């Protein structure tokens, strides 16, 4: 796997996991050494910061990582989530609720 693919794999795993995940678990999934994964994660952090990306990679003690939205964009994210929450239920969703009740 190329470094670009390793970085992409880490992004995908962090995005899908949503919660902080241990370096060892990421290393196991990539079949890489934990130190290599830490170096890759630090590269991702730097890239996101340099690009002023809407996403950020956070590090938590002891040795966990998480992808999340950058705080600067929090208000906009909140607005879109509030809009989605107030959306009416689709006919299919109403049908499912009718079956459950």
Predicted regions and their residues:
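Short capping segments at the starts of secondary-structure elements
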Residues: 16-22
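Phosphate-centric recognition/catalysis
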Residues: 1-8
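Short amphipathic alpha-helical interaction segments
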Residues: 33-43
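A short acidic, leucine-rich amphipathic alpha-helix
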Residues: 25-29
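Charged low-complexity interaction tracts in eukaryotic proteins
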Residues: 43-75
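Short, Lys/Arg-enriched N-terminal segment that forms or immediately precedes the first helix
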Residues: 1, 74-85
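Short amphipathic alpha-helical interface segments
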Residues: 10-15, 88-101
């Amino acid at each position: 796997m190329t470094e670009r693919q390793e970085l992409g794999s880490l992004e995908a795993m962090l995005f899908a996991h949503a919660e902080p995940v241990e370096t060892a678990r990421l290393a196991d999934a990539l079949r890489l050494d934990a130190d290599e994964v830490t170096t890759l994660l630090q590269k991702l952090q730097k890239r996101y910061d340099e690009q002023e990306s809407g996403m950020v990679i956070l590090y938590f003690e002891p040795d966990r990582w998480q992808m999340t939205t950058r705080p600067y964009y929090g208000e906009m994210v909140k607005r879109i989530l509030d809009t989605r929450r107030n959306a009416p239920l689709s006919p299919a969703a109403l049908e499912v609720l009718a079956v459950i009740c």
